[in-house]
């Protein structure tokens, strides 16, 4: 009798002991991680084992663990050992593991006729769309692929031999991540008809936009790009054989690529052998950070072309433009560059074989910046006026630009950098945009990450795994991330890229020891406005210390670039609404005491004055970035 009672009791006690040894935990916000066989359950146990203090767990880090359930985790961990088998399950894996992967669009020979209106539509292949439609008509695409990761859209042989009008509004993933949009043989041989792209790919992260054989051999059609690619980050636009052999087909680019970060545009065989075409670029590349544009064989052999660039790359930071074989062998025609290339920091402009062989072309440059190279151009018909021969220090000074008025350049926006003396209770100061612009992703489980290649020497394997075609944006994203991760560290820097949370813990503890705390700014409240500093606390007593900072890098899975940062002071501060004095955020700021190794053109010195090693520089930790320090 007693044996029958004691045996179940012993089993129950053994079960409870086993479960307790597995550190079964329930996360806050109702996020259960009780199953010890999930990636998150494993991560929590790993934290408990490798961090020596009992301070509250950093759920902002632990919640970035892979969302795979136990069954999915076991399945994909087994599959990844066979990369050929794994790549066939890529789409389901990316969806389950919260990764950013491109969709696979299959070719389509379906024909589309009639007037069509597409609203809130995405990830489609339009082939032979609107081909040889007779009579006037109208096709409209509105709110197409909004706020998506890797939206892929292909328009091939679109509107060929058709006089229809086409309008794309809010097209190209406004606010999306890595959109891939291609227009091939668009409006070729069209008699009339117009195309309008309004608010195209605004605010996109790493857009990849291609127009090939666009409006070739067209007659009298007009193509209008308004607010094209604005506020984007690190993207690439290409126009090949655009308006070639056209007759009176005009193109307008208005507010093209404005406020972009490291944007690239290529125009090849643009307006070649065209008759009487007008091309206007207004407010092109305005207020950008290092925009690069290339015009090759632009307007070559045209008859009476008119090219106008107004406020081109104005008020940008650095930037490069190349015009090769521009308006060569043209008959008559006019090209005007007004308010051209007046960047804050000196950029580079190269004009090669410009207007050569033409019949009386008129080329005018008015109010253009420094560091321009003109090779092999028609000297008799080119005029240059109001050349700004300033030093880079002059141009970098905000008070010297635009008639002595201070210009708000978004790349050195107010509050992005500040002095340590600002971190006092009661100080009112601007806060920059600290919102995380990266796509939402999760870490790979370490067991899976360890089995995937991660080096530039194996990039072909990675491209195969992630279905990344050569020269695709996915391939470029992977290559850029790997190159940055393999870059040699700066003097005194220790660095590592981590694609699992366990790797981040290992790196931080290897630099700082096991008694560590990781911090981030609590939310984005106060961003892009004025804030008041409330109570403030110096980490490690406010003494100069060492920290580890981790910043996101664009990659299919969540990837962080972590590096040791010597000689810093770290602060936590309550952030208040300056009017109501209510607490709206809890921020983390880091002050770099030693800036002697920073470049003289670093944005901090443009914003604050002075130079390397002369001042300390502070900044906030942005949303989803992190800083590690030893625990107090």
UniProtKB/Swiss-Prot annotation:
Pfam families: BURP. One of its GO terms (cellular component) is apoplast. Residues 1-27 form the signal peptide. It comes from the Eukaryota. Residues 28-109 form a propeptide. Residues 417-631 form the BURP domain. Keywords: Apoplast, Cell wall, Cell wall biogenesis/degradation, Glycoprotein, Secreted, Signal. It is found in: Secreted, Extracellular space, Apoplast; Secreted, Cell wall. One of its GO terms (biological process) is cell wall organization. InterPro entries: BURP_dom (IPR004873), PG-associated_BURP (IPR051897). Glycans are attached at residues 125, 143, 258, 280, 336, 371, 389. Non-catalytic subunit of polygalacturonase. Interacts with polygalacturonase to form heterodimers. This is Polygalacturonase non-catalytic subunit AroGP3.
